[in-house]
From Swiss-Prot:
Protein name, UniProt field: 3-dehydroquinate dehydratase
Active-site residue list: Y24 (proton acceptor), H99 (proton donor)
Organism placement in taxonomy: Bacteria, Pseudomonadati, Pseudomonadota, Gammaproteobacteria, Alteromonadales
Site (Transition state stabilizer): R19
This protein's encoding gene: aroQ
Organism field: Shewanella oneidensis (strain ATCC 700550 / JCM 31522 / CIP 106686 / LMG 19005 / NCIMB 14063 / MR-1)
GO terms of molecular function: 3-dehydroquinate dehydratase activity
Binding site for substrate: N73, H79, D86, L100, S101, R110
Ranges that cross the membrane: none
Length: 146
């Protein structure tokens, strides 16, 4: 079986490396995705990636994917998007939620997630390494299911 993971990055993550590096780090999104592609290929897993500042594009990607697992950093949509939650529940694909910063150590409005209670797991506060942790977990879960 050919395993596939969909990696979703929400609004403003295209600015990684430039936007508040003290909070989000110095790596660009392209650098992070390149590392994850290497990790996925080494495990024999296909990684599909989308980043968008538009909620509907992320929803359409969720609806259209044939991936067996999703890793999502919803960014600001974490705290606002019932639509993303409904899209994820609608396709019934297990997902991990990732945040670069520790959202619980930040402003109170960032403490609530519309996705966390439905995620397999939530990884936050590890910077870009959080994506690697999520991909490792996703690969293990996919491989154990076959």
């Amino acid at each position: 079986m050919n395993h596939k993971v969909l990696l979703i990055n929400g609004p403003n993550l295209n600015l990684l490396g430039r936007r508040e590096p003290s909070v989000y780090g110095h790596q660009t999104l392209a650098d992070i995705v390149a590392q994850l592609n290497e990790q996925a290929q080494a495990a024999g897993v296909q990684l599909e990636h989308i980043q968008s500042n538009a909620e509907f594009e992320l929803i359409n990607a969720i609806h259209a994917t044939d991936a067996q697992m999703i890793i999502i950093n919803p960014a600001a949509f974490t705290h606002t998007s019932v639509a993303l939650r409904d899209a994820l529940l609608g396709v019934d694909i297990p997902f991990y939620e990732v945040h670069l910063s520790n959202v619980h150590a930040r402003e109170p409005f960032r403490h609530h997630s519309y996705l966390s209670d439905k995620a397999i797991g939530v990884i936050c506060g590890f910077g870009a390494q959080g994506y690697e942790f999520a991909l490792t977990a996703a690969i293990k879960r996919l491989k154990s299911a076959t």
